[in-house]
Each structure stands twice: as structure tokens, then as C-alpha cells.
Amino acid sequence: MTDTNVLANSATDNQETTHFGFETVRKDEKVHKVAQVFHSVAAKYDIMNDLMSGGIHRLWKRFTIDCSGARPGQRILDLGGGTGDLTAKFSRIVGEKGHVILADINNSMLNVGRDKLRDSGVVGNVHYVQANAEELPFPDNYFDCITISFCLRNVTDKDKALRSMFRVLKPGGRLLVLEFSKPILEPLSKLYDTYSFHILPKMGQLIANDADSYRYLAESIRMHPDQETLKGMMEEAGFEQTTYYNLTGGIVALHRGYKF
């Protein structure tokens, strides 16, 4: 085999593999592995969110809503919206003339979210769609705002997903990415590592009977692009005036970009 063939085969291998936590897997395999994680945790997802963050995730999401610019009558996509925390808030903001779509690739998460919102009386202006972020099944220039909350790190091809989000946003529309990121203080980073890799899996085992899924959660956070890298990825996808806000010392970051 020639050197050229070796390089070509290597390039093909690189295109076909990605990371699942710290593990290198084929891209199609990651889709199935991530699906298994969220099928497993869906029923206990809200309880674990409160326990893992001490309830602070509610403040992060409230800040996201405040930065969204959502107004009555607008169309909002809550992508990877899971159990519907943001959807419920957007539903009240956009009102009867507005429209919120809760989209998630995982039907278990989508079912939990739909049942929770309907039980809470959130009906009428909310619809549910099972969709892949990389290939959104919506028209061009359709949404006024898209949020993707604690989901992007699980997407296999993040660049493709960002381009897909850009396509379905209206000119003047906003994308907000709320995601775990990189702590900006070294002491906090060390403490967070200890919590993530030693305490979090034990909590997952105790509450959800699933340590492995929460070990993946910790690993997926470490493999996710840092704040500046994600900002650059959004700009490469076409977003402008892209900024980010570090929340809780950078444990979480909110990125916002516009389509013009």
C-alpha cells in the first residue's frame, strides 16, 4: 500500500469516527449510544437536574429566556428541549398567536416532556416534533428564535447542526446555546472535576440506578468545545454578533448569535 493510500484511508477513518465521552466510536454508533443514555435517564431527568445543580439550572434557563428576546406572536424552536422547561416559559411569552415547537431526537425524552407540559396545562400553542438537530425538518427562515439547552454536546456533527439551525432561522433571528463549558477559575475546575467524576456517577446510581449514563455526562462535558471554540463554530456557520456569558464561573456558558 502506498503512502497516499494510507493517508486516504486515515482520512476516511477520521471522518467516520467521533467521541462518545472519552471513547472513540463510529459516528452512527454514537447516535445509538446517546439514544440509550437518554432512554435510560428520561424518567428521572428532572429530579437529577435539580440534585446535580442544586436547582441552579433553573436560574441558567431563566437567564436564557431573558436573553432570547422572545415576544408575543413569535415562533420559537426549543431544540433538544427534553422535558420542556424552556418550552413552558416560551409558551406563556408568545401567547395564543405565537407558536413553540419542542423538538428532540429522543422519543423517551419527548414523551416525558409532552406529558409534563400537558399535565401542567401548557397546551394550544405548543407542538412536539421528533427531529435530528443536524437535519431539521422545517422550512427556511421560519423561526424567530432557537434555543438548544444542554443538548449540543450530545450531537454527533455539531457544525452540521449549527448550519441547520442557521437555515431555519429568520433574518434577525437569534440562536441561544446553553451548555456546560469550561470553568474559568483553576480551583473551581479541580473541584468540579472531583464532583463530576466521583460524586455524579454515584448520584446517578442511587437515584436513577444508572451510573454509566452519568459518567458519560461528565465525559461529554469535558469533550465539548470551550467557550471561544464554540463561538468560532457559530461564526463559521454564519452567525453574527456572537457573544457568550459565563455562568457560575464558566461551569455553564450561554452563547448567543444572530442571523442577518
UniProtKB/Swiss-Prot annotation:
Q: State which Enzyme Commission number(s) the record gives.
A: 2.1.1.163, 2.1.1.201
Q: Where does S-adenosyl-L-methionine bind?
A: T83, D104, N132, A133, S149
PROSITE patterns registered for this protein in UniProt: SAM_MT_UBIE, UBIE_1, UBIE_2
Supply the InterPro entries for this chain: SAM-dependent_MTases_sf (IPR029063), UbiE/COQ5_MeTrFase (IPR004033), UbiE/COQ5_MeTrFase_CS (IPR023576)
Q: Which UniProt keywords apply?
A: Menaquinone biosynthesis, Methyltransferase, S-adenosyl-L-methionine, Transferase, Ubiquinone biosynthesis
Q: What's a single GO MF annotation on this record?
A: demethylmenaquinone methyltransferase activity
* Reactions it catalyzes: a 2-demethylmenaquinol + S-adenosyl-L-methionine = a menaquinol + S-adenosyl-L-homocysteine + H(+); a 2-methoxy-6-(all-trans-polyprenyl)benzene-1,4-diol + S-adenosyl-L-methionine = a 5-methoxy-2-methyl-3-(all-trans-polyprenyl)benzene-1,4-diol + S-adenosyl-L-homocysteine + H(+)
Pathway as given in its UniProt record: Quinol/quinone metabolism; menaquinone biosynthesis; menaquinol from 1,4-dihydroxy-2-naphthoate: step 2/2; Cofactor biosynthesis; ubiquinone biosynthesis
Q: GO terms for biological process? A: aerobic respiration; menaquinone biosynthetic process; methylation; ubiquinone biosynthetic process
In terms of SUPFAM superfamilies, this protein maps to:
S-adenosyl-L-methionine-dependent methyltransferases
Keyword Hydrolase among record annotations: no
Give the Gene3D superfamilies listed for this entry: Vaccinia Virus protein VP39
Query: What's the family?
Result: Belongs to the class I-like SAM-binding methyltransferase superfamily. MenG/UbiE family.
Functional note: Methyltransferase required for the conversion of demethylmenaquinol (DMKH2) to menaquinol (MKH2) and the conversion of 2-polyprenyl-6-methoxy-1,4-benzoquinol (DDMQH2) to 2-polyprenyl-3-methyl-6-methoxy-1,4-benzoquinol (DMQH2).
The record's listing under PANTHER family reads: 2-METHOXY-6-POLYPRENYL-1,4-BENZOQUINOL METHYLASE, MITOCHONDRIAL, METHYLTRANSFERASE
Name this polypeptide is given: Ubiquinone/menaquinone biosynthesis C-methyltransferase UbiE
